[in-house]
């Protein structure tokens, strides 16, 4: 069966209506029952309560729940209550972060206007868009939203903005002509209109062929529902980390419990040791700390024009190895600009126009007069190609409005897509003159003369050939070319179409949406950082390739392809194909998803940028979807993890740099937490093996994990950013947080902390006072971890350099933490709550001294390890 664009309007009417007449009332009712309302449907969503319950599925949380229950059974109600409060607070925080209203489909619904003008019973009547059905004939005027997909029946100079669906920035000229080719991309189906687009110029009518979820917008809605959001590398890492840590904790707890029972301890005490170990090992505040650090990251990125909608995207950007970028407005300025003139037989850069040259001056003035656009106080109204001509005149010192007042328009033949030209009549220095603007081939066929240096000559075949070659050269460079001509006409008559002949060729004007000034440098920085930039656009291949070459994405033409080529490939073939392609043109939403997925299956973290409705499914499929804030549709913003408020590719590179630094800082926070916890675990194990009392009560460990540890961990997450991260390659997708080097650091640092803690415990226990020993061990562990924060600034020695003082947050966290632990062990009113006793001044100084020793010891370890790495 042929596609609708391959059929005439009458054939399509017979196909969907059974005749060439509008629908009858009975047919309308039947079709509405058959096809349903013209609406987009949404899938079932999880309730907030379901999301809240899912927060308790984490292995670490389950272990904490068991620890709380065990503490309660053993009579330690305070510890059990604190653990439950911590778990609940983390669950609430996780729920708040997860509950993001999935409003993409709601935004898609807004793309249709509330009403449509439908021909029924021979009368045009407005009806709600939801009541439009297959077979309806819709009447369109400039400014109307198109409520459904359909085949054009009547067309009077129609131009449709389809940018939301295709990504093409210019309005598409429509026609009623049949298209013979098979598998024509959506952007080239010039006899069809689609829901989600709107008429910018002209008028016409169309017969509805698809409604609701069967429209092109509906297909995008279906893709949004079936495209699952991927976890960021950090989420995957933390999940894996949680599972591994849970297994380790359970193994350690089982070993400790077995040793205690084997040594003759009663089961109650053995359980207490196991619970203490579990609480010591689990970094209860980790989830909250990561969230807080990421939140601070979003604030920093917002100042740099990147608004983060999904918190984990902050870090995820740092892992990106492929950036698939839209062209228009992201890599380019999204503003048509004149690049070259061809006049007097030569190509001239736009900024080199000489207004003293009569032909150059006439061409510039003609481009202002034969033009319907305006630019008043910076507000541009009209077709982008026409506003580009106005803006050039302004930049060269010509006031377009003054030119138009001096040479007012007396008559015109408006532009239409069949003639591909427009003409206006003016009195130029007392001579009635018709100025004509249009497609190069059309004007050349109507030209008998050519002007050079103010003189008119009969045009020769050689001159035509040179002009055509220049036009082809501009086109190969991705430039949009307009030809200008003129001739003297009668003073007393209105222009007619017959006047548009025997013209004097004046010149060509070539324009394009040029690259942003910063795009080339951003692409180069991208490559230096080991990230491959790829252009994906709905625009034409020649235009896309020209821009990509100028900014360094494309090196040769073989690296560019069109969406039609992708249709012929299987997913496996596409996986091999993407390696050699840097530019994709004329692509559909399905193509974009397949390209993103192909790179993901090759082990890459993919960021996708976009602004149109057509980009939304790929934005959701990508690891990090990035939408445009200025030109972007609400649908694309809803589907994205991040929104660029300046629509600038260079901003993505800044975000990647932030993401890499934030990951590095989060890793430092995790190292800080785990090394401290490992020190506590070793202390508990040592006490158990040496038949000593439990060195810590669960409340001690919770105090450390939630209060004195949290502040330094957050401060490490705010560590000043390194300028060297963009010289590194993206980290591998399968790289775990728990690398061999990372685990060695944790082990050595934990051993140092444990040693100082057990020395303090031994000093306190010399008279058999278990409470004093526990208090000194607790205080030393707390202070050791506060000092250890400075160790975690880097895996290289930093304490004896000026870098030790470059994080004011860490210094503040250290001071606050030291004050808190000092208050706990010196204020009597807090003793019962925290299961401690008062320490004397000498005991306090002993605690401080032992804790401080961790600094030089660990710094020496780092220095030795750094030397061996070389």
Feature map (PLM): residue ranges:
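Membrane-helix interface and helix-disruption motif detector
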Residues: 766-770
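A C-terminal functional module that forms or caps the active site or interfaces directly
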Residues: 792
């Amino acid at each position: 069966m042929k596609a609708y664009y391959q059929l005439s309007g009458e054939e399509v009417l017979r196909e969907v209506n059974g005749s060439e007449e509008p629908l009858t009332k009975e047919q309308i009712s039947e079709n509405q029952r058959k096809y349903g309302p013209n609406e987009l449907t949404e899938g079932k969503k999880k309730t907030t309560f379901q999301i809240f319950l899912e927060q308790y599925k984490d292995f670490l949380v389950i272990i904490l729940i068991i620890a709380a229950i065990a503490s309660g059974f053993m009579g330690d109600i305070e510890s059990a209550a604190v653990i439950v409060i911590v778990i609940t607070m983390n669950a609430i925080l996780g729920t708040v972060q997860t509950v993001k209203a999935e409003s993409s489909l709601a935004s898609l619904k807004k793309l249709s206007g509330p009403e449509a003008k439908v021909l029924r019973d021979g009368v045009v009547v407005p009806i709600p868009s939801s009541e439009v059905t297959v077979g309806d004939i819709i009447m369109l005027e400039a400014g109307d939203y198109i409520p459904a997909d359909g085949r054009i029946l009547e067309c009077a100079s129609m131009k449709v903005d389809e940018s939301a669906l295709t990504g093409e920035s210019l309005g598409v000229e429509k026609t009623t002509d049949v298209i013979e080719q098979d598998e024509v991309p959506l952007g080239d189906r010039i006899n069809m209109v689609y829901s989600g687009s709107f008429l910018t110029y002209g008028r016409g009518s169309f017969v509805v062929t698809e409604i609701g979820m069967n429209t092109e917008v509906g297909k995008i809605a279906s893709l949004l529902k079936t495209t699952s959001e991927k976890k960021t590398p950090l989420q995957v890492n933390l999940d894996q980390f949680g599972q591994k840590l849970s297994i380790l904790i359970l193994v350690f707890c089982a070993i400790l419990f077995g040793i205690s029972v084997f040594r003759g301890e009663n089961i109650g005490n053995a359980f207490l040791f196991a619970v203490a170990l579990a609480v010591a090992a689990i970094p209860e505040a980790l989830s909250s700390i990561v969230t807080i650090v990421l939140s601070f990251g979003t604030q920093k990125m917002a100042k740099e024009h990147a608004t983060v909608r999904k918190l984990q995207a902050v870090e995820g950007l740092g892992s990106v190895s492929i950036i698939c970028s839209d062209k228009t407005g992201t890599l380019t300025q999204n503003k048509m600009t004149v690049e070259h003139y061809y006049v007097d037989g030569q190509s001239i850069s736009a900024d080199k126009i000489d207004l003293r040259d009569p032909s150059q001056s006439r061409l510039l003035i003609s481009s202002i007069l034969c033009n319907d656009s305006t630019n008043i106080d910076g507000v541009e109204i009209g077709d982008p190609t026409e506003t580009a001509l106005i803006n050039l005149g302004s930049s060269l010192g010509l006031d377009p409005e003054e030119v138009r007042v001096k040479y007012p328009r007396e008559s015109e033949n408006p532009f239409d897509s069949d003639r591909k030209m427009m003409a206006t009549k003016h009195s130029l220095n007392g001579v009635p003159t018709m100025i004509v603007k249009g497609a190069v081939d059309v004007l050349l066929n109507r030209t008998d003369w050519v002007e050079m240096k103010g003189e008119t000559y009969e045009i020769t075949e050689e001159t035509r050939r040179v002009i055509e070659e220049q036009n082809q050269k501009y086109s190969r460079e991705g430039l949009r070319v307009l030809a200008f001509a003129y001739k003297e006409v009668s003073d007393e008559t209105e222009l007619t179409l017959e006047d548009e002949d025997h013209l004097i060729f004046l010149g060509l004007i070539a324009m394009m949406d040029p690259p942003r000034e910063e795009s080339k440098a951003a692409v180069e920085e991208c490559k230096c950082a080991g990230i491959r930039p790829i252009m994906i656009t709905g625009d034409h291949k020649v235009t896309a390739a020209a821009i990509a070459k100028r900014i360094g994405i494309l090196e040769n033409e073989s690296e560019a392809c069109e969406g039609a080529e992708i249709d012929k490939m299987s997913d496996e073939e596409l996986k091999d194909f993407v390696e050699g392609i840097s530019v994709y043109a004329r692509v559909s939403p399905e193509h974009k998803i397949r390209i993103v997925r192909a790179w993901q299956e090759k082990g890459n973290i993919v960021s996708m940028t976009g602004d149109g409705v057509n980009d939304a499914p790929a934005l959701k499929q990508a690891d990090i979807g990035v939408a445009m804030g200025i030109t972007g549709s609400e649908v694309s913003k809803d589907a994205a993890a991040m929104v660029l408020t300046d629509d600038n590719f260079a901003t993505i590179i800044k975000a990647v740099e932030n993401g890499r630094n934030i990951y590095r800082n989060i890793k430092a926070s995790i190292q800080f937490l785990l090394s401290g916890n490992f020190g506590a675990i070793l202390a508990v194990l040592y006490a158990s093996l040496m038949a000593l009392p439990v060195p810590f009560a669960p409340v001690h460990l919770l105090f450390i994990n939630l209060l004195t540890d949290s502040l330094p961990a957050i401060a490490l997450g705010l560590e000043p950013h390194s300028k060297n991260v963009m010289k590194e390659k993206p980290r591998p997708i399968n790289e775990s947080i728990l690398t061999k080097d990372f685990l060695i650091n944790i082990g050595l640092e934990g051993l140092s902390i444990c040693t100082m803690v057990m020395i303090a415990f031994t000093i306190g226990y010399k008279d058999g006072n278990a409470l004093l020993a526990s208090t000194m061990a607790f205080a030393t562990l707390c202070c050791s971890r506060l000092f250890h924060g400075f160790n975690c600034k880097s895996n290289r020695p930093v304490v004896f350099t000026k870098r030790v003082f470059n994080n004011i947050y860490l210094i503040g966290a250290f001071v606050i933490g030291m004050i808190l632990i000092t208050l706990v062990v010196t204020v009597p009113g807090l003793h019962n709550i925290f299961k401690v006793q008062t320490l004397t001044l000498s005991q306090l100084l002993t605690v401080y001294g032992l804790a401080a020793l961790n600094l030089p010891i660990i710094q020496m370890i780092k220095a030795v390890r750094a030397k061996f790495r070389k």
